[in-house]
Each structure stands twice: as structure tokens, then as C-alpha cells.
Design a protein with these regions (language model features):
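Acidic/histidine-rich helix-loop elements
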Residues: 163-187, 215-220, 264, 380-411
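Active-site region of glycoside hydrolase catalytic domains
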Residues: 270-408, 417-437, 462-465
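N-terminal carbohydrate-binding accessory modules
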Residues: 141-202, 422
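Conserved small/polar residues in nucleotide/adenosyl-binding loops
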Residues: 469-470
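An active-site-proximal structural segment forming one wall of the substrate-binding cleft
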Residues: 185-187, 192-200, 220-246, 256-294, ...
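C-terminal motif of bacterial Sec signal peptides marking the signal peptidase cleavage site
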Residues: 18-21
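Short, surface-exposed alpha-helix to beta-strand junction/turn motifs within ectodomains of secreted
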Residues: 60-93, 119-122
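Acidic, Ser/Thr/Gly/Pro-rich low-complexity segments and short DxT(G/T)-type signature motifs
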Residues: 31, 38-54, 79, 119-142
């Protein structure tokens, strides 16, 4: 029995010893192993757009993209941003997935643009991408143009709109505006003589015809037609060119309805043809100082931001159809109208739509069709004074917050350059039928106004566009 007790005590002591040796005691727990730290590699550049060393890149706003080998983040530090030489950074850079994107402005030909992505701008958690630089070169300066389109630009030169007069509209057939002409003025021969002496080459005579028509066959009031003709005669006597158009007749030219209803479209086309036949017959013996313009600013009331963006191009096709009808109608009257220059607008007379594929020039055996555009960019500066929520400054010296971003000098150059490349270089004249800027409320703001007007004029001249002040 004594031996048995000794054995039991010995066994218990051994078990305790084993337990302690195996770390089973709560006073001395085994530490948790630390997993190895994974290696974080910095993002590296796979490609750029434009590619490094690329040449013949179009001038203007250049979209740049830098693609990395993994999803990346961008620093919030405002001092870190792409560094550009040979151009300027427009707006802010952004990242999406593996791509860093931003816009570079460069309006100069044959210019090397170098882009540097500084270290610290791009990275992932735990690692920053190294600094990266690449460059590309803009296209060569095109040969100086010398064709019918540039010759016509010189002939039209700088002009003035006889606006707020014959374009006055009541919005009703047979009902002249109850307030009379909006300009409350009576043109005389002296007006046109003085315009010529001031350096004006062209007068755009804007006319609304529908207020002086009552019903089918849409005969234009004879006295009204005579008054319009008198002004054209005065301009001719002064040695001016004249662009005569159909202006605020949009109230019966409902392009949204016409684009979706063939009966309405046929009725509108019938009236367009009958109206333009009368105009063309009245002036068919006039010389080549006279130009016709099919329409003013045909649009659905939303100035290019309406149903035209979602209707599958129906409104654009309808306007193309109307422009073709006007050209055919004028040519059919014979006389000097067989070869008279005719201006046609794109949707809303917008350069944007004139540069898109939805705008199709009319076919013309005489090959004498011009493109008419209007330029009021940015309208927050040109059409809206600062006391009515507009911007007070414009251009590269404008103060932060006082100008419309994306619409400074680079935008003017890019727009006019594209018009020249698409049309003038292909012997199709382009004229800016309207441009201008409202008076602003401070001397400083009006200095920017003056700079804007001068810049637009100089740019138009550079790119062979004639222009007519509103």
C-alpha cells in the first residue's frame, strides 16, 4: 500500500512536469507567430496615349492617358499634378482603375510637348510610382490655303448684322410685331454708306417673313418685300456685300414635330419652298454681291441640348432635307441665282454640330454652298452680364472663379482650326454669321470684353473665316 501511494505521487509529479514542459501552463503562453510581410511593388507604366515619341498629333485639346500595370490611386496633394512643357494642363487629372487621364492644350504646330508624372502623384498603398516622362509632337503647319473658300472669306471680310429690325417677330402669321421694329430705327442710304466708310464689307440682312404672310400660297406682303429690297439696294449702292436670310420663322418651322411627323414636315417644306421662291425671284438679277442664307438658328428650343441628342438624328436629317430644298428652290429660279453663293447652317448654327457627321451639305451642281455658323462661346461671358449670373472675365489672365473653364483662347483656336480643316481646306467657305459680347458692368470686365472680341477676330482671320458682328 505504501508503495502504491508513492507510485501515484510520482506519476502525478511526472505528468505535471510534462505539462509544464509542453507549455500547458496558463502563466507562460506560447507567442502567436508573426506572418511574413508581403512585398508591395510600385505601379509601373505600361503605355501612354499619345505614345512616347508620337508625331503628327492634332493641335488643340489633347486627351492624354497613362496606363499602369495595376489599379492605382492619385494623391490628394494639390501641389502634385502632371507637369507640362510645350503646352498647358487643362483642368484636373483623374484616375480610373489602371489609368491616369488629363487634357493638355497646345495650339501650336510642330511643338514638342513633354509630360512629367512626378513621384508621389500615383501609387498604391505602401508604394509610390516612380517619376515618369514622355513626349509627343504636334502636327506640321499646313500649307497656306489659296482657294475659292479663302478668296470668298476675303471678299466677305468683316461684317455687321442689320439685327432687331426685319427679324422682329410676333410669332404669328400675318401679324407684324405690335411694337414695330425692335431697334426703333429707320435705315437710310446713309447707314450703309457710313458702314462702308467704317471698314465694313458685308451686311447680313436678317428677315422674318412669316409675319407678312397669311395663308397658302404664302404670298409675302408686297410693301414688306419692297422695304427689304430697298435696303438691299442701298447696301449695293454703298459697295457692300449682302447676306439675305430667313430668320425668326422658327415659330412655323417646328423641327421637333416635323422630324417625327411626315405630314407636318411636308407642310413646312411646302411653305419653305413657296417663301424662298418669292425671295429668289425678287433678287435673281442681283449681282454676286448678294448671298442667300437658308435659315438662322433652327433648333427645338433647347439650343442643342434637347431631343436632338436622343432622337437618333431625326432633327439633323430634317434640317439637312430643308437645306437641300432651299438650294434646289433657289437654283430653279434661274438668272444669277443659278450660281449664287448660298449659306446653310447646321443645327442651331452651332460649330459643334457643323463638325459632326450628322450635318450633311446639300448637293449643288454649281458647287457654291457655304457653311454658316454662329459663335458665342462661352455664352456665360458673351450673352450674360455678371449682374445676371454671368462671368465677368475671359482668357488666360482671368482671375480664378471669374471665367468659364474650358472656353478660353484654346477653345477658340481649336474650334476655328477644325472648321478650316474640315471645310475651308476642302474649298468650302465658312462664315461666322453672328458673334459678339454684351457690355459688362465694370471697366475691368469690359477690358476682357474688348480682348475677347479682338481675339476672336484675329483667330477667324488666321483660319480663313469671315465674320459678322451681331
Amino acid at each position: 500500500m505504501k508503495f502504491k501511494n508513492i507510485f501515484s505521487i510520482t506519476a502525478i509529479m511526472a505528468m505535471l512536469t510534462i505539462n509544464v514542459a509542453c507549455g500547458g501552463g496558463s502563466d507562460d503562453p506560447e507567442p502567436t507567430p508573426t506572418p511574413p510581410t508581403p512585398t508591395v511593388t510600385a505601379p509601373t507604366v505600361l503605355s501612354t496615349t499619345p505614345a512616347n515619341g508620337a508625331t503628327d498629333i492634332a493641335t488643340g485639346s489633347i486627351s492624354v492617358q497613362v496606363s499602369y500595370d495595376k489599379d492605382v490611386n492619385m494623391s490628394n496633394d494639390p501641389s502634385l499634378k502632371p507637369v507640362i512643357s510645350g503646352g498647358t494642363l487643362s483642368g484636373s487629372a483623374s484616375v480610373s482603375g489602371k489609368n491616369l487621364s488629363f487634357t493638355v492644350n497646345c495650339s501650336d504646330y510642330e511643338t514638342k510637348v513633354t509630360v512629367k508624372i512626378p513621384k508621389g502623384l500615383i501609387g498604391v498603398t505602401g508604394a509610390l510610382a516612380d517619376e515618369y516622362s514622355f513626349s509627343f509632337t504636334t502636327k506640321k503647319k499646313p500649307e497656306a490655303l489659296n482657294n475659292d473658300a479663302t478668296a470668298l472669306a476675303k471678299k466677305l471680310g468683316w461684317g455687321w448684322n442689320l439685327g432687331n429690325h426685319f427679324d422682329t417677330s410676333s410669332g404669328q402669321d400675318g401679324v407684324p410685331n405690335q411694337w414695330g421694329y425692335w431697334d426703333n430705327a429707320t435705315p437710310t442710304q446713309a447707314l450703309y454708306t457710313n458702314l462702308k466708310a467704317a471698314g465694313v464689307s458685308t451686311v447680313r440682312v436678317c428677315v422674318t417673313w412669316g409675319n407678312y404672310q397669311t395663308a397658302d400660297p404664302w404670298t409675302i406682303d408686297a410693301n414688306y418685300m419692297a422695304e427689304v429690297k430697298q435696303n438691299v439696294d442701298w447696301a449695293e449702292a454703298a459697295g457692300l456685300n449682302v447676306i439675305l436670310n430667313m430668320h425668326h420663322d422658327e415659330y412655323w418651322q417646328d423641327i421637333k414635330q416635323a422630324a417625327s411627323n411626315n405630314i407636318i414636315n411636308e407642310n413646312v417644306k411646302d411653305r419653305i419652298a413657296k417663301t424662298w421662291t418669292q425671295i429668289a425671284e425678287t433678287f435673281k438679277d442681283k449681282g454676286d454681291f448678294l448671298f442667300f442664307e437658308s435659315f438662322n438658328e433652327v433648333q427645338d428650343g433647347n439650343w442643342g441640348w434637347g431631343d436632338n441628342l436622343t432622337d437618333g438624328g431625326k432633327q439633323y436629317k430634317t434640317l439637312n432635307e430643308w437645306n437641300q430644298l432651299v438650294v434646289n428652290t433657289i437654283r430653279a429660279t434661274g438668272g444669277n441665282n443659278a450660281t449664287r453663293w448660298i449659306g446653310v447652317p447646321a443645327y442651331a448654327s452651332s460649330p459643334k454640330f457643323a463638325l459632326e457627321d450628322g450635318f450633311v451639305l446639300p448637293t449643288d451642281a454649281a458647287n457654291r454652298v457655304m457653311v454658316s455658323v454662329h459663335f458665342y462661346d462661352p455664352n456665360t461671358f458673351t450673352l450674360t452680364p455678371e449682374d445676371n449670373g454671368g462671368k465677368s472675365e475671359w482668357g488666360h489672365t482671368a482671375a480664378s472663379g471669374k471665367y468659364q473653364t474650358g472656353s478660353n483662347e484654346e477653345h477658340v483656336v481649336e474650334t476655328f482650326q477644325k472648321l478650316q480643316e474640315k471645310y475651308v481646306a476642302n474649298n468650302i467657305p465658312v462664315y461666322i454669321g453672328e458673334y459678339g459680347c454684351v457690355m459688362h458692368t465694370t471697366d475691368r470686365a469690359n477690358l476682357f470684353r474688348n480682348y475677347y472680341l479682338e481675339y476672336v477676330c484675329r483667330a477667324a482671320h488666321t483660319y480663313n473665316l469671315s465674320l459678322i458682328h451681331i
